[in-house]
Amino acid sequence: SAIKKIKNKIDTVFMISPLTDNKRIKKIAKSTTGFIYAVSRLGVTGARSNLEKSTLILIKRIRKFTNKPTCVGFGISKPEHVKSIIKAGADGVIVGSAIVDLIAENINNEEKMLNYIYAYIKSMKVATISHKNLSI
């Protein structure tokens, strides 16, 4: 059936927060079939100016138990955040609110909005690869 085909192609993605204990990290690492979503901080999502040190500690804790892909989200909004996160051992970042803000700020000018979004995403992508000395 179509539903069975879809079910077989959807990976599980579990979240790990700074408060998740090591026993649970091991269980999540074993159970996830997609990637691990590392929550950078407690509270709600939204762009933040600073990256908390606990985020980098969390990435290193996760890496003690698994090499499964790990992406960090919640408050990631600057290329400097991305560089630190990748350097700490994560595979990627999840950015939402910062892009939503660009849309909201430029809602009446689609071309400008798309140009800003493109430039922003490019700056974030460059930050993921500049740490590894790769090129786009």
Briefly describe each language-model feature range.
Residues 86, 98-134:
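C-terminal helical cap(s) of enzyme catalytic domains, especially alpha/beta-barrels
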Residues 47-55, 60, 81-93, 104-112, ...:
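Active-site-adjacent loop and "lid" segments of alpha/beta metabolic enzymes
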Residues 6-13, 30-36, 87-92:
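Glycine-enriched alpha-helix->loop->beta-strand junction motifs that scaffold or abut catalytic
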Residues 12-16, 36-38, 70-74, 93-95:
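Hydrophobic faces of well-ordered beta-strands that scaffold small-molecule active sites
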Residues 20-30, 66, 72, 76-93:
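Catalytic cores of alpha/beta
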Residues 1, 11-20, 45-48:
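Catalytic beta/alpha-barrel core
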Residues 15, 25-64, 102-106:
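Glycine/Thr-rich beta-alpha phosphate-binding loop at enzyme active sites
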Residues 3, 25-26, 56-60, 82, ...:
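Generic structural signal for well-ordered alpha-helices
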